């Protein structure tokens, strides 16, 4: 993963403008009273690069980071059972708090991929979890 991808999402390494990192500490979500500095960078121009970054991480070994989606790996080994896979991802990425409707939608979609294709099932499920709006808001 090159610096270009992190620059594209507005967070170049070692380039934070303040001690608050990249997030404006006083950012309030529009039309609410909710203080949410982490959403100060979220806009229509940053959403696609963030999705691209998630896809890149899922499919490439980068900077010593490798996510193992093979059948022998921690995600792929659960891929034959779409429900078990999504529950496992929900535990890891959402602290076991994945909404039921989100879980159902992901299980249904992942179930369309043949159970014999553990790598595709696992990487698809992980991508759907980490790019969901619920993941961004809750975790």
Language model features with spans:
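Flexible, low-complexity segments enriched for small/polar residues
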Residues: 1-139
């Amino acid at each position: 993963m090159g610096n270009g991808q992190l620059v594209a999402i507005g967070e170049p390494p070692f380039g934070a403008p303040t001690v608050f990192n990249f997030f404006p500490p006083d950012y309030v979500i529009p039309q609410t009273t909710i203080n949410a500095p982490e959403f100060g960078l979220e806009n229509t121009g940053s959403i696609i690069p963030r999705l691209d970054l998630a896809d890149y991480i899922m499919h490439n070994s980068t900077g010593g980071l490798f996510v193992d989606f093979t059948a022998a790996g921690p995600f792929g080994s659960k891929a034959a059972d779409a429900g078990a896979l999504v529950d496992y991802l929900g535990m890891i990425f959402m602290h076991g708090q994945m909404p039921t409707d989100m879980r159902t939608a992901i299980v249904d979609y992942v179930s369309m991929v043949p159970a014999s294709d553990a790598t595709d099932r696992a990487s698809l499920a992980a991508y759907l979890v980490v790019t969901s709006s619920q993941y961004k808001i809750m975790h």
